[in-house]
Structures are given as C-alpha cells and as structure tokens.
Swiss-Prot record:
Recorded GO MF terms: CDP-diacylglycerol diphosphatase activity
Descriptive protein name: CDP-diacylglycerol pyrophosphatase
Catalytic activity annotation: a CDP-1,2-diacyl-sn-glycerol + H2O = a 1,2-diacyl-sn-glycero-3-phosphate + CMP + 2 H(+)
One Gene Ontology cellular component: plasma membrane
Associated pathway: Phospholipid metabolism; CDP-diacylglycerol degradation; phosphatidate from CDP-diacylglycerol: step 1/1
Statement: the UniProt record of this protein carries the keyword Cell inner membrane: yes
Chief site of localization: membrane
C-alpha cells in the first residue's frame, strides 16, 4: 500500500511539473510568434499590397488567415485576424464569432494544392489544443492528416458514435475522449465550441482545459472529439495527438 501511495504521489508531482513547464513555455516571447506573423505580417501585407504572404490566404472581412505550418509537408493553420488566445476565450461561445472549425474545413483544399492531387477527406483532420497543451498563445486550428491508427479506430466505432457527447470506447492515444456525430448542416450553423459548451456539463466554465478535434466519417457525417486535461493521467488535452503531420495515410 505504501508503494502504491508513493507511486501515486510521484505521478502527481510529474504531472504538476509537466504542466508548469508548459505554462513557462507559454509565458515567453516565442509564444507570440503566430500572433506577430498574423498581425504584423500577413494582415498588413494583404491590406497594403493585396498579397497574403507569408500566409497562404488572408480574409480580413471573414476574420481569418491560413498559414502553412513549418512542420510537415501538408500541415496548415487557420487563425483569427484579431486577438484570441485559445479555447479558453469566451469569444468562442459568442454566436457572432466566425465558425472557425467550419472555415478550417473549407481550408483543407490547401493541402490538396500543396500535395499536387486531391487529398481524400477521410485523410484530413482538424485539431486545436487546450491551454496547457499548446505552445502558442494565438488561437490556431491545425489542418493536417489523421493518424492511420486513429482513422481505423474511428471507422470501427462508426456505429457507436451518436449525436450526443459520449465517451469514445477505448479513448484515443491512451487518453479519454468524448465523441459526437454532427451533420454538415449542423456544422455550418453552429460552432463545435458552442456545442461543447452548451451540451457537456460544466464545460463552459472550463473550456480552456479542453482540446477539440474534427474528422469526417465514411457516411459524410463529422465526428467531434473532445479531450479534457487530466493531470493524473498526464493528459494535457493536446488534441493534435490524433494527427500525423508526415501524412503516412497518403502513402
């Protein structure tokens, strides 16, 4: 019993230290890199020269930009043209805020353009990390390939995912996930952030502790995946873990 208690204590210490390191990283200058690229480079260049560079696309009226990420051959980021830190922002549950997940899904075409041929929807995933699971303090949705093992697991659970938020059997990547099926028409009308905040008990008060992902299924529906930070299981709620930026699924 003493050994079990000691092991439990060690796990807590490790989790707290890991979280502390993550927070320390977020308080440095490098955590503002993406925001500076958007606000000091992409947006001004588009407004003054009609050139989105270094972004791939800048849509000031729609409130977003798309940037090629330096990691992976096909990974892109969708980001707002104004200050939003991340999932903890109350702006994400405001109906007047752009539906960033839907916009990010539309931006998947940049992957195909870069690849030189169509990237199948089943190979694409969207993900945003929690406050402790990210390295940048500017809201960004990762548009990238899905891990083949995650793709297979979601395919196998197609019949088990309903229109309500329920635990995904077996979780993903060793972490617990909630899963919810949504239709395209639902997704167009309502942001996944609002679905999470309004439908999962106490989620609205703890949005910053959630990572959120989205994948398309073979029946053309979408699956939303939400994971919440849990220090005891060393889960920092980095939903990006379901992605493979090297795109093995395309080989």
């Amino acid at each position: 019993m003493k050994k079990a208690g000691l092991l439990f204590l060690v796990m807590i210490v490790i989790a707290v230290v890991a979280t502390g390191i993550g927070y320390w990283k977020l308080t440095g200058e490098e955590s503002d890199t993406l925001r500076k690229i958007v606000l000091e480079q992409c947006l001004p260049n588009q407004q003054e020269n009609q050139n989105p560079s270094p972004c791939a696309e800048v849509k000031p009226n729609a409130g977003y930009v798309v940037l090629k990420d330096r990691h992976g051959p096909l990974q892109y980021l969708l980001m707002p043209t104004y200050r939003i830190n991340g999932t903890e922002s109350p702006l994400l549950t405001d109906p007047s805020t752009p539906n960033f997940f839907w916009l990010a899904w539309q931006a998947r075409d940049f992957m195909s353009q870069k690849y030189g041929q169509p990237v199948p929807d089943r190979a694409v995933s969207l993900a945003i990390n929690s406050r402790t699971g990210r390295t940048q303090n500017h809201f960004h949705i990762h548009i990238s390939c899905i891990r083949p093992d995650v793709r297979e697991q979601l395919d196998n659970n197609l019949a088990n995912i309903s229109s309500r938020w329920l635990p995904l059997p077996g979780g993903l990547r060793g972490h617990e996930y909630l899963a919810r099926r949504v239709t395209e028409s639902e997704l167009v009308q309502r942001s996944p952030f609002m679905m999470l905040a309004e439908e999962v008990p106490e989620a609205r008060e703890h949005m910053g502790s959630y990572g959120l992902a989205m994948v398309r299924q073979s029946d053309n529906s979408f699956v939303l995946l939400a994971t919440q930070r849990n220090l005891l299981t060393l889960n920092r709620a980095s939903a990006e873990e379901i992605q493979d930026h090297q795109c093995e699924i395309l080989r």
